[in-house]
């Protein structure tokens, strides 16, 4: 009967371990969510446990040092972003979970940056906003748009969460718009507002499909073409004018040309053989401001291809060279002794190097003797 005792001990130990595991991992009530400011100090109580209760603290499953405790409370100094996490307090002997805190470290919001722009005039405009610095915790924004005393609907952008769209109800209105935005989070609140006239926020998107090409046989010309921005809804009724800038890559200074109409321009003063960068901006003909610059186009003016001599072109020169090589040099004359009045019979010609003037005089004398 002595043998079953060890087995009984093992069973008791296993049951005890199961109880401890169940106590540490059994479902508990949702942790308390707490927000604290970056750089501050915080004291986390262990639920309803007495101050002198023997407890152990863990964060995200890792034990914390005992020197961080003040009794049963956990004290954290100079909070950093890395302090965010799930803090749990256990009874030191039984490992019974006493309390949980989900700590978020962040900042209150600063005054938001708000701007409005009409790139689809005269259909409407949009407003967008952002915080100048991150808060590291969730923020809630609320936007209000007034046209005079009338509240306008601001439809949320389907893709950009910090943007909404407003449709113009009355074109060419002299009544100002006022857009207000407030932002809040668990640590604070802030707000701002802007007021503007309809025409002051008109700003088209940049021109599209900017292309630059060399002009054949013109080493100083580049032909530039572009398209009106596709977001501009009615270019016939609300025409755009354009501003073109260009420069060779070797220089930093831009040259500018303002164009009242059309979507093409020929640059006539380009440096031959130098690569150029070209950009175009757009603006409503009467109101608003210039768009941002378009995507840059690059091009190099036409250059003449170097001419390479062909075999056919070289042939006449070879013939001429061969013929001239057979001619006597200026100071050399091929003479026949018979021509010099030697009286002998025909013989092979031989070379006599004499000055040209002497050779001509000798030839003249020979001719006179033959006439006599």
Curated annotation (Swiss-Prot):
<keyword id="KW-0325">Glycoprotein</keyword>
<dbReference type="InterPro" id="IPR007110">
    <property type="entry name" value="Ig-like_dom"/>
</dbReference>
<dbReference type="GO" id="GO:0008284">
    <property type="term" value="P:positive regulation of cell population proliferation"/>
</dbReference>
<dbReference type="InterPro" id="IPR036116">
    <property type="entry name" value="FN3_sf"/>
</dbReference>
<dbReference type="GO" id="GO:0070110">
    <property type="term" value="C:ciliary neurotrophic factor receptor complex"/>
</dbReference>
<feature type="glycosylation site" description="N-linked (GlcNAc...) asparagine">
    <location>
        <position position="142"/>
    </location>
</feature>
<feature type="region of interest" description="Disordered">
    <location>
        <begin position="301"/>
        <end position="340"/>
    </location>
</feature>
<dbReference type="InterPro" id="IPR003530">
    <property type="entry name" value="Hematopoietin_rcpt_L_F3_CS"/>
</dbReference>
<feature type="compositionally biased region" description="Low complexity">
    <location>
        <begin position="311"/>
        <end position="326"/>
    </location>
</feature>
<dbReference type="InterPro" id="IPR003961">
    <property type="entry name" value="FN3_dom"/>
</dbReference>
<feature type="domain" description="Fibronectin type-III 1">
    <location>
        <begin position="108"/>
        <end position="205"/>
    </location>
</feature>
<feature type="propeptide" description="Removed in mature form">
    <location>
        <begin position="343"/>
        <end position="372"/>
    </location>
</feature>
<keyword id="KW-0677">Repeat</keyword>
<dbReference type="GO" id="GO:0070120">
    <property type="term" value="P:ciliary neurotrophic factor-mediated signaling pathway"/>
</dbReference>
<dbReference type="GO" id="GO:0004921">
    <property type="term" value="F:interleukin-11 receptor activity"/>
</dbReference>
<keyword id="KW-1015">Disulfide bond</keyword>
<feature type="domain" description="Ig-like C2-type">
    <location>
        <begin position="27"/>
        <end position="104"/>
    </location>
</feature>
<dbReference type="Pfam" id="PF00041">
    <property type="entry name" value="fn3"/>
</dbReference>
<keyword id="KW-0449">Lipoprotein</keyword>
<dbReference type="InterPro" id="IPR036179">
    <property type="entry name" value="Ig-like_dom_sf"/>
</dbReference>
<feature type="lipid moiety-binding region" description="GPI-anchor amidated serine">
    <location>
        <position position="342"/>
    </location>
</feature>
<keyword id="KW-0732">Signal</keyword>
<dbReference type="InterPro" id="IPR003599">
    <property type="entry name" value="Ig_sub"/>
</dbReference>
<dbReference type="GO" id="GO:0009897">
    <property type="term" value="C:external side of plasma membrane"/>
</dbReference>
<dbReference type="InterPro" id="IPR050379">
    <property type="entry name" value="Type-I_Cytokine_Rcpt"/>
</dbReference>
<feature type="disulfide bond">
    <location>
        <begin position="46"/>
        <end position="89"/>
    </location>
</feature>
<keyword id="KW-0675">Receptor</keyword>
<feature type="short sequence motif" description="WSXWS motif">
    <location>
        <begin position="290"/>
        <end position="294"/>
    </location>
</feature>
<feature type="glycosylation site" description="N-linked (GlcNAc...) asparagine">
    <location>
        <position position="70"/>
    </location>
</feature>
<feature type="glycosylation site" description="N-linked (GlcNAc...) asparagine">
    <location>
        <position position="190"/>
    </location>
</feature>
<feature type="domain" description="Fibronectin type-III 2">
    <location>
        <begin position="206"/>
        <end position="306"/>
    </location>
</feature>
<feature type="glycosylation site" description="N-linked (GlcNAc...) asparagine">
    <location>
        <position position="60"/>
    </location>
</feature>
<dbReference type="GO" id="GO:0097059">
    <property type="term" value="C:CNTFR-CLCF1 complex"/>
</dbReference>
<keyword id="KW-0393">Immunoglobulin domain</keyword>
<protein>
    <recommendedName>
        <fullName>Ciliary neurotrophic factor receptor subunit alpha</fullName>
    </recommendedName>
</protein>
<comment type="subunit">
    <text>Forms a heterotrimer with LIFR and IL6ST. Interacts with heterodimeric neurotropic cytokine composed of CLCF1/CLC and CRLF1/CLF-1. Either alone or in complex with the heterodimer CLCF1-CRLF1 interacts with SORL1; this interaction may promote internalization and lysosomal degradation.</text>
</comment>
<keyword id="KW-0336">GPI-anchor</keyword>
<keyword id="KW-0472">Membrane</keyword>
<dbReference type="InterPro" id="IPR013783">
    <property type="entry name" value="Ig-like_fold"/>
</dbReference>
<dbReference type="GO" id="GO:0019970">
    <property type="term" value="F:interleukin-11 binding"/>
</dbReference>
<dbReference type="InterPro" id="IPR003598">
    <property type="entry name" value="Ig_sub2"/>
</dbReference>
<keyword id="KW-1003">Cell membrane</keyword>
């Amino acid at each position: 009967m002595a043998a079953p005792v060890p087995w009984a001990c093992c069973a008791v130990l296993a049951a005890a371990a199961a109880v401890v595991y169940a106590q540490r991992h059994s479902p508990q009530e949702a942790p308390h969510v707490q927000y604290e400011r970056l750089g501050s100090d915080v004291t986390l109580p262990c639920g309803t446990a007495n101050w002198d209760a023997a407890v152990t603290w863990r964060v995200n499953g890792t034990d914390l040092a005992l020197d961080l405790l003040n009794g049963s409370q956990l004290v954290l100094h100079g909070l950093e972003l890395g302090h965010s996490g799930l803090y749990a307090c256990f009874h030191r002997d039984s490992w019974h979970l006493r309390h949980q805190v989900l700590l978020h470290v962040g900042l209150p919001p600063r005054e938001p940056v708000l701007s409005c722009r009409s790139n689809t005039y005269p259909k409407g405009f949009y407003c967008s906003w952002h915080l100048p610095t991150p808060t590291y915790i969730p923020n809630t924004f609320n936007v209000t748009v007034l046209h005079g005393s009338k509240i306008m609907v601001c439809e949320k952008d389907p893709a950009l969460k910090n943007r909404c769209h407003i449709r113009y109800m009355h074109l060419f209105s002299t009544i100002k718009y006022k857009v207000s935005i407030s932002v809040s989070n668990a640590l604070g609140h802030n707000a701002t507002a802007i007021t503007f006239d309809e025409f002051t926020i008109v700003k088209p998107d940049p021109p599209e499909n900017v292309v630059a090409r060399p002009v054949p046989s013109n080493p100083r010309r580049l032909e530039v073409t572009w398209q009106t921005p596709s977001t501009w809804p009615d270019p016939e009724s609300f025409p755009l004018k354009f501003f073109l800038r260009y420069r060779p890559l070797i220089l930093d200074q831009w040259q500018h040309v303002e164009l009242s109409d059309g979507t093409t321009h020929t640059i006539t003063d380009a440096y031959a053989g130098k690569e150029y960068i070209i950009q175009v901006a757009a603006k409503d003909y009467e109101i608003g401001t210039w768009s941002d610059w378009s995507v840059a186009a690059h091009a190099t003016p036409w250059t003449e291809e170097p001419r390479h001599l062909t075999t056919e072109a070289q042939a006449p020169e070879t013939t001429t060279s061969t013929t001239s090589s057979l001619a006597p040099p200026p100071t050399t004359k091929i003479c026949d002794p018979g021509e010099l009045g030697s009286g002998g019979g025909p013989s092979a010609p031989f070379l006599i190097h004499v000055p040209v003037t002497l050779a001509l005089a000798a030839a003249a004398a020979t001719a006179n003797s033959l006439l006599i």
